[in-house]
């Protein structure tokens, strides 16, 4: 439903403008791909079945794709004991989990930035329109692994998504997120984009937005609206 696209001086990829060497990031991408749902499954699996069978058995229950691949790579690299210990103390926060197993470098405590504004195009359109929403932000002191989060609410469905990044050097950035407002009557529950005003909100964070864990920071947020006619 959402897609992240690049704008001038924006994320050319999720790993643009990183503050660390590629060797430090070798495990970071597969680790964060586990996500909160993947971590939740692994915690429940450990509670219900233990870790007999090691990494292979633990990771096999994840759906094939980036989650299982990330689990296999990371658990194999750090070992089952360190993997399970981190799972039990990180509260399903994928970024903090990846920092705890040293797959991602810890965020900088002096990281600083601000959210400068937003824009949307078009401002009004019928259901089926793809709206492009832009967030502008500045980085004052270099940041570590974090996310840009967007949430949309209105008379139709409430939707949201987070986009991970591995940090930014000081500078000014603009990142676009596109939202396709296409009805889907086959979905459960059905998706219908009703006419009215929709509010969107961006947050730019180091670590997971809203996390209380060390190194996590919210640099700011910004809101805007668009209309479905």
Regions found by a protein language model. Name each.
Residues 143-153:
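Beta-strand-rich binding/interaction modules
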